[in-house]
């Protein structure tokens, strides 16, 4: 006998011959297929949408009085660890902002704890109001230049595809490995048919070769011209708006009725305080609309476009057979989420989050000595330059004497990266753009190897900040004069198992401390990317300065 049709038990409710569990009456429903609005009712049974129209009756009925109903929002690419929250706390926080699905790459924790880290994140996803679907970390470590806590080759990953919660292969950051035909890199690309890319500034024949190898999405575009070229080549465009990476304003012009099916929103890296105070994908919608994008196109980017890109036909639209994931909002331009439903239930009805205790060590290092963080040299020096609103850096040169650092008048500070895995290696460099006046910050979040990174106006305050992070077993610290503010992160030195409200309060305290230090907003997020060797142009690792364009170590003083 043939298998029964999908949702055969729901056919009577869909036909209206049996009552639905819930019918939302008198709603304005967003049609993600045509990017338009339709007045009507929404009928739900067993967590599935069974129909729209005017003829449905329900065991429970609710009159929305013309309120707008939008499919549940989808984040196309995120690293949950960057929120500083474990998945349970993260899910409850973003669900309140209309998000019901996130496509997450757990490569932060995988770089520290390997397969054990991935298993931890998978175990955290059960029973949440947000469906967390994971992309397997493809680059652990990010490049051969990085020394982290784990190495995952294709054989290590082979047992994950097909498991519940695993959707595909995460961002392929090792662009030189792809273009060079590295067998180990190519072996990973055949593990899944859904393969995310990572191709900052890649263009022309190299972009063609990268696409030919399998990755077909990118969230690293920072200019409209770059985005247009990648769309023309068939890539999916993830328009990013994170804590530091703010690309919506530059990329809105490329989103049209003709390209919107290939465009989605993502947040990539967002601290919990930004999520709580400003929002998640709902914030992306508001930002895009304020930048001139039609609300209906923005809504399509947040719903159906990512669902189709990731081959998720059970969500992304208010249509029969799809999950009853949706949010009720005030108007499409201001997009204030009043209520979120996940699988037909208000997210407020989901059980309070219960964090799983981590089972792996965070730090295996000691505080470096003053001699280890000294920098020697005189003359032309390579300096890492921050770029406001981006994780890209500039490769700058200054005439200076290392013994005279810091040079507050020219905004030149010392930057230090300490190996967290017990190897004892320490890299020292110079950074421009923080604007600190007096103090230092340090953190055990340092993409992607997550060594301990610090920047400050003097050796004493830098060492104080490093000491605070290491004594906490991982976390973030700010030092101003003798005042030390610390946010411990007890899960791998990346996340906290404490409630979101406590983490947000800790972040608020750190923000107050950094305001006393002076300088840019959210310096911790900028700091966390200064060791990321897969993003141009200049980086610092625990081995020293790294040219991320030439892909080689370079001296501070040539």
From Swiss-Prot:
It is an enzyme of class 3 (hydrolase). Its cofactor is Mn(2+). CDD domains: AdeC. GO terms for molecular function: adenine deaminase activity. It catalyses: adenine + H2O + H(+) = hypoxanthine + NH4(+). Its EC number is 3.5.4.2. Keywords: Hydrolase, Manganese. One of its GO terms (biological process) is adenine catabolic process. It comes from the Archaea. InterPro entries: Adenine_deam, Adenine_deam_C, Amidohydro-rel, Metal-dep_hydrolase_composite, Metal_Hydrolase. Belongs to the metallo-dependent hydrolases superfamily. Adenine deaminase family. This is Adenine deaminase. The lineage of its organism: Archaea, Methanobacteriati, Methanobacteriota, Stenosarchaea group, Methanomicrobia.
């Amino acid at each position: 006998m043939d298998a029964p049709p999908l949702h055969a038990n729901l056919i009577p409710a869909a036909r209206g011959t049996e009552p639905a569990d819930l019918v939302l009456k008198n709603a304005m429903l967003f049609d993600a297929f045509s990017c338009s609005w339709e007045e009507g009712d929404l009928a739900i049974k067993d967590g599935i949408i069974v129909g729209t129209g005017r003829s449905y009756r329900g065991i429970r009925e609710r009159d929305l009085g013309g309120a707008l109903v939008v499919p549940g929002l989808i984040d196309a690419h995120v690293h949950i660890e960057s929120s500083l929250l474990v998945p349970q706390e993260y899910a409850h926080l973003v669900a309140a902002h209309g998000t019901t699905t996130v496509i997450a790459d757990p490569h932060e924790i995988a770089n520290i704890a390997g397969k054990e880290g991935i298993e931890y994140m998978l175990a955290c996803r059960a029973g949440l109001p947000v469906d967390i679907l994971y992309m397997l970390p493809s680059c652990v470590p990010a490049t051969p230049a990085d020394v982290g806590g784990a190495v995952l080759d294709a054989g290590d990953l082979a047992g994950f595809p097909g498991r519940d919660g695993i959707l595909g292969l995460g961002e392929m950051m090792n662009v030189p490995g792809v273009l060079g035909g590295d067998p180990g890199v190519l072996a990973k690309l055949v593990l899944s048919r859904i393969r995310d890319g990572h191709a900052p500034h890649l263009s022309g024949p190299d972009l063609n070769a990268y696409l030919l190898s399998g990755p077909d999405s990118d969230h690293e575009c920072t200019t409209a011209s770059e985005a247009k070229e990648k769309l023309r080549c068939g890539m999916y465009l993830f328009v990013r708006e994170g804590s530091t990476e703010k690309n919506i304003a530059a990329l809105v012009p490329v989103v049209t009725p003709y390209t919107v099916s290939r465009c989605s929103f993502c947040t990539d890296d967002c601290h919990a305080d930004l999520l709580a105070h400003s929002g998640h994908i709902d914030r992306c919608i508001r930002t895009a609309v304020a930048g001139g994008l039609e609300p209906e196109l923005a809504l399509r980017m947040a719903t159906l476009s990512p669902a189709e890109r990731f081959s998720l036909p059970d969500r992304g639209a208010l249509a029969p057979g799809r999950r009853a994931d949706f949010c009720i909002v005030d108007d499409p331009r201001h997009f204030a989420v009043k209520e979120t439903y996940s699988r037909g239930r208000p997210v407020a009805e989901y059980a309070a989050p219960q964090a799983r205790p981590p089972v792996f060590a965070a730090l295996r290092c000691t505080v470096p000595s003053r001699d280890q963080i000294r920098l020697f040299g005189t003359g032309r020096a390579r300096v890492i330059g921050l770029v406001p609103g981006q994780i890209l850096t500039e490769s700058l040169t200054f005439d200076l004497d290392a013994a005279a650092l810091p040079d507050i008048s020219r905004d030149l500070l010392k930057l230090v990266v300490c190996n967290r895995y017990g190897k004892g290696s320490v890299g020292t460099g110079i950074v421009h753009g923080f604007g600190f006046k007096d103090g230092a910050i340090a953190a055990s979040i340092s993409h992607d190897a997550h060594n301990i990174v610090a920047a400050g106006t003097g050796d004493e305050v830098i060492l104080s900040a490093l000491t605070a992070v290491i004594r906490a077993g991982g976390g973030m610290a700010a030092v101003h004069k003798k005042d030390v503010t610390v946010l411990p992160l007890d899960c791998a030195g990346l996340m906290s198992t404490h409630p979101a409200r406590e983490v947000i309060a800790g972040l608020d305290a750190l923000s107050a401390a950094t305001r006393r230090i002076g300088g840019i907003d959210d310096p911790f997020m900028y700091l966390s990317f200064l060791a990321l060797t897969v993003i141009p142009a200049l980086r610092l690792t625990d081995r020293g300065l790294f040219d991320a364009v030439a892909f080689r170590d370079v001296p501070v003083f040539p």
